[in-house]
């Protein structure tokens, strides 16, 4: 009897990860993105993700069922649904013919349960200093540690209010070695991602905090503005 109760508890506390990353249900996601730096001017732009549905494609000379997502910059990202999670497995730039294989990067785990943890390879991309003739961007690799923090979030976006969302929090730290003027910079990274059942990613916040006044802290806020189903 206890065994049956335990099974019921596990099933009731877990969720189907594909519901929160419905690449076969939603065709287009449109987002607003605001970059809020401490030392530079704010920037606001739009981002669009276009799902091409499930495709049989060759990856490392092996046929796989993948989900391509075309981004607004012409880059296509490829996702694969496996038994233990949803992974990003490759990408292709605008003029390339072949898919570039990546180390598997977990987007959401299976099963999706409270306090579930995992880590992924990531890199900094918000830290920027503008000069008269060039932009200096502090980009470096690090490990981002993720955790399912909540499965009952209510989130307001320009596209509407979404209930029973999951919240994924992430954190990491790294060092960037710059030129003689900049030296070594300590960086802390904080991330929050909200996913709605049947819609997918609806909001994301990311903070990259440096230990120098030269770059300061930069925050990014991404909000779902609209979506279109297949």
Model regions and ranges:
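Conserved functional acidic sites
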Residues: 14-230
